Each structure stands twice: as structure tokens, then as C-alpha cells.
């Protein structure tokens, strides 16, 4: 049988999303990425992340907007909308 893998590691700048879900089942946030685009311009991407793990949720509450972070997790799709997001299992603060 084939073994499938679903693991994602992304780093960037922490960006908080305005949401009333921060005290609920998950803590939503995003990772800001600035990448050189094919036409030479800078593309700003905001990668959607949800933290379900209690330790990660608590860690996020102590961090400031723009903190360099690395997130380890798995890619998921929302049951309702089908939107893709990274489900954060572990978070590291990167040295500036």
C-alpha cells in the first residue's frame, strides 16, 4: 500500500486576522510572505493558518504582529467552504 504524506513547514511574518474565533475551537492567523513574482514585482501572500493545539494557541497570544515564525503542520480543507488552510501543530519563533 502507498504511504501518503501531508506535512507542511512554512516560515514568514506573523499576521493576526480579525476574528471572533480566537477564544473558540481554533485561533486563526496568517503567515505573511513577500516573494519576487515572475514579472519582477513583489507579491505579498498571506497564508491562512489555524491553531487547534492549546499550547500553540497560548504561544500565539504572547507574540506581536510581525514576529518571524516557522509553523509545522498539515494542510486541510474546511468542511463548510472547502477553503484550504494550514493546521498548525507546532510553532517556532525565529531569531531576528
Where are these regions (language model features)?
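Single-stranded nucleic acid-binding surfaces, predominantly the OB-fold ssDNA-binding core
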Residues: 1-96
Amino acid at each position: 500500500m502507498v504511504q501518503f504524506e501531508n506535512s507542511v513547514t512554512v516560515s514568514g511574518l506573523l499576521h493576526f486576522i480579525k476574528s471572533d474565533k480566537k477564544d473558540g475551537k481554533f485561533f486563526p492567523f496568517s503567515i505573511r510572505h513577500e516573494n519576487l513574482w515572475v514579472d519582477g514585482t513583489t507579491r505579498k501572500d498571506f497564508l491562512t493558518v489555524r491553531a487547534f493545539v492549546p499550547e500553540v494557541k497560548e504561544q500565539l497570544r504572547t507574540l506581536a504582529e510581525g514576529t518571524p515564525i516557522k509553523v509545522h503542520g498539515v494542510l486541510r480543507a474546511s468542511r463548510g467552504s472547502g477553503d484550504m488552510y494550514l493546521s498548525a501543530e507546532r510553532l517556532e519563533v525565529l531569531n531576528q
